[in-house]
Structure formats: C-alpha cells, structure tokens
Amino acid sequence: MKEKGKTLNGIIEAACAIAGIAPVGTSKMHEFENYDEYLKNNTATEEQLEEQRKNPLNPAPLISIAIVAKGADVGMLESTIESLQSQTYDNWEACLAFGLDDYGSKGIADTSHFRVVIASGTVKELSDLINHQLRGAYMLQLFPGDILTQDALYTLAQALMDTSSPEVVFADEEMTDENGIYPYFKPDYGRLTIMNHNSVGRPLLVAKRVFDLVGGFKGAESFDIWKFALLALSNSKMSAHIARVLMSSKRRKDVSLSPKEIDEMDRILADRVDKRANAYCVEGHEMGTLRIRYVPKRTPQVSIIIPNIDGIENLKRCIESIEMRSTYSDYRIFVADDKRNEPLIRKYLDALKKTRAAKPIEIKSGMSIPAILNYCARAEINDMLLFINGSCEIQSPDFIEELSGLASMKKAGAVGGKIIDTGGNIVSVGDVIGLRGWAGSPYKGENDDNADRLKSSFTWLQRNVSAVSGSFMAIKAQRFMTVGLFDETLSGVGWDTELCIRLMRRGYENYFTPYAAAKLYGELPDYDDASSDNLTRCYDSFRQTLMTGDGYYNPNYDYAASEPILSIKPYKPICLNPNYK
C-alpha cells in the first residue's frame, strides 16, 4: 500500500510542480539585525551568575553529558570542555569517548566531572557505547565545538522544577560558520512540526526514563540527532522550552535525506499514527526536511461548503477550480443560497443543481459567515468538512487529500492551507494568536518565496499552529459538531480562531500545510474594521493566550511586527491589545 501511495504521490508531486509548490532546495540562513543588542539584554549578568553559584538548586539532579570525541579537533574539544568547567551548576558528569588512535594528549585532568572511554569503532558505535556509561537522572548530548552559556545547565535544571514536571527540556541556540552567526529561536514542541524538521535542535535535556525507553543517543549525524529528539519528545509525558539562547554550535552543512533515512522515518511515523491509516514521508520543500502524507484506509467523504457571498464570478471561479484541478473524487460541493433575486446567480445555482455539480442549501438572508457555515454543515454531514471562501481559486491538485488526510490524524483539530493573493503575496500561512494584539498570519502581505530558512519554516513546512483561517479549513465533521461548531456571536472576525482555541483546550492540535494552496480574489475581514462588540467577544476568547503568548511563536519575536523580528525586551502580546486595561 505504501509503495502504491508513493507512486501516486510522485504523480501528484509532478502536478504540484505545475502549481508552483514543488521542493526547491535550500534557502539561505536568516540573520537578525539586532541580535547583538538582544544578547546584551537577554544574557545572564555576572551578578546573576554569582548568585547561582552561591545558591545552588535543591534538588539538583545529576546531569550526564555524552561527548563522542573521535577525530575531534583539539581546539574545538577544548572550547567545549572549558564551557562545561565554567558552569554555575555543579552536579554534572561528562563522559568522553575517544577512538584508539586519537586520544593522545587529550587527557582530562578534572576527574571529578569527567570520565574517559577509549575504544575502537565508528562514531555511531562509540555513541552506543557511551550510552551505557551515563549515570545521571538526565542526559545531554554535546559535540566538540559546542559552547554552553555559563548558566546553561543551571537554567535547564531549573526548568525541571516546573509544576508540570517536564521529562524533556530544550532551549534556543545559535549556530556559527565562516559567514556569520545564526540564532535559532524555536517554537514549543509540536508533533507535526518535528516530523517535518528538527524543530527542537539542541541543547536537549532528557530524563533517564525516556532516554532508556528510546534506546539512548543515536549518533552524531544531523539525522541521528533529529531521530533522537523526535523519539524522546513523542515518548515524554511533558516537555518544556526555554526561550533563551543557551548554546552555540558549529552550523552543519545542509544535506538531503537519504532513501534509507526516509524509510526509517516512515517506520517511526507508522508507530506514531492511527493504525486506521497509512502514513509515509517524502522530502519536503527545503533540503533535509520532510513532508508527511497521511492516507486514511477508508477514503473520507468530503463536504465542501462555500458560503457564496462574493458574487457570481468568484463563485464560478472557485467551483471550476475545484472541478478542474482536484485529483480527489469522493466529495460534494454545497453552496449557500440566500434566494437573492439576481438572475445570473439564480441561473448558475439552478444549473449547478441540475447537473449535480453542487447542491444549493437555502439559508436566511443576512446570516453571518459562521452562521452560514454552521447551517450548511448541519444540513449535509459527511466524514469531513472543508470550508472554502467563495473568492478562493484552488491551486493545488491534491488539496483535498492533503487537508483531509492531516485532519484525519488522531489528535487533529482544524487544518488550514496556504492562502495567497492575486499578486503572489501571503494572506495566511497559519495564524499566530497575539499578532498585532489580536491574531494574524506571519509574513502577511509579503511575497510567497523562500527568502531564507526562517521564512520557509513558517511558509513551506507542515507544522503545528494555534489557529488557521476559516477561509480554507478542514475538520472532521463529528469533531466539529462535538466541540460546538463556529461561535455565531463572532459575526465579523475571530470565529475561526475561537474554534481553534476551543479545539486546543479539548486536547486537539491545529495544523498548517503549504501543500494545499488557494488564491484569494479580494480580502479577508480585518480586526481593524470589526465592531466593538465583535472585538470584545474576541478579547474574551483570546485573553488567556494573549496573556501567555502563542506557544508556536517564539516569545522573543515582536508581536507588533507582521514578520518574526527580535524584540530587545520581550513582552506578552496582550500589551498590544486595545481592550487590555
């Protein structure tokens, strides 16, 4: 079944290339203009470091650090050792593994913290060997050249004391090469995001229970590090993300995933998804990333619901794009019909009904968008609901497969596709709750290109998000009914975001995918134009997330900007909301 799926996927990928969404390779690294200034304001001071030394944590669990030093550059190894010796946290041990031929003068004098293993074998074999030498309650993997900030271990250990009792803790980092310094500000853990790329990176502190369960560190290659992170996080009861740069490492060269590595991810994915579906991976848009294909064993019947409030030309374009481009067959289109006496619309709707191309559903005149969508969803219930703005033109041939597939995942809430405007600019790539004080899409209004890796991580990867646009959204029909449909009191804006918040509170996850794309002829409603009553309801619904920040958007980013730029002094997005007092 999987091989058939991959063959079909190859055909679909070729079609997607025509639509402009085929993999394009590697983007350049993103450089933050104010990173130096940010570090000055967000790095532990000497006074704070001294305070940590004087007041050690209690409890202070033993942290075991694995370092495979086979073939290591002496200077790089020494820099890593020096960074460990300068830690304000003292309860740690480091186990270094050397090959038989490269130990030489790399002796370690500090036997209170360091233990040395000398053995023959590959880096992978030494990594396996060192796993059995670690005695700590928590494990950390470093490589020669990694440099921890002086408070790194203290900060990681401190996070373990959180009331949620995390079993995995990770932090932001920076990578360096001959061309510059590239900080990586990460989102919180998301199960879809980490299946697409290693979104947690390092430093990564893992509890012994999880470490033993997944079989320890996997090796030193990028794929090995990703695999360990994915397995550790998926087997942990809780994780924590420290939104501070705690480590600097040498940037690794971007490489494509080998067929063997992709097959290995297939096996991992098969163990993690609902057994009622076939799931497999193909290489993603960016080199070294993956795209997840989720194919339910029973093809879902899909109800496509179009509110029809944007005129006959837009409606015809929308429906024709579905009919002409879709590679999916088991769907039916439903169009809201408010019985308006416009001859062209009446003639077109009658023709749709006669040819069974779509079924008009009579609604009352003056109903709000969420009310229209709810009414149509109740009237014709199939397995899957797909809401499409009538001003959208479908761009991706397999948009139904992509959206309904991800929406069929066990934990899936709402799934949204990419929306661009007629100029090729971004309208929606998943929404951040708190952007500009309300909610919005990163990079809105900017060209849909892969200018750099940061932008591509938002616009060209399947990922967890807090909210998606209701103008191009899929959700299981039963799940939609169970959580209570769209909130009809939010008549103008926010009804889609409010549903996504409710889904997350029920334990579901919302996903964005760039592989289902639509072009919008017109504009979506904006918070700037909403009524005061509408905004008051939005504020009540969003307030909790506005207070804490969107977990899938790094808190070091400035919520006032439409794209991720650093805030020298990070703040909560509620500060931007005009209703906040």
How does the language model describe each region?
Residues 4-60, 260-302, 423, 435-464, ...:
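C-terminal, non-catalytic tails of nucleotide-sugar-dependent glycosyltransferases
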Residues 63-73, 87, 302-314, 318, ...:
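A conserved hydrophobic helix/loop-capping motif in glycosyltransferases and polysaccharide synthases
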Residues 81-91, 162, 320-330:
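Short, acidic, metal-binding catalytic loop of nucleotide-sugar glycosyltransferases
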Residues 119-134, 363-380:
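Glycine-rich, basic loop-to-helix element that forms the pyrophosphate-binding segment
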Residues 136-147, 381-395:
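Short beta-strand-to-loop acidic/aromatic patch adjacent to the donor-nucleotide binding site
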Residues 210, 221-245, 269, 399-403, ...:
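A short, conserved alpha-helix in the catalytic core of glycosyltransferases
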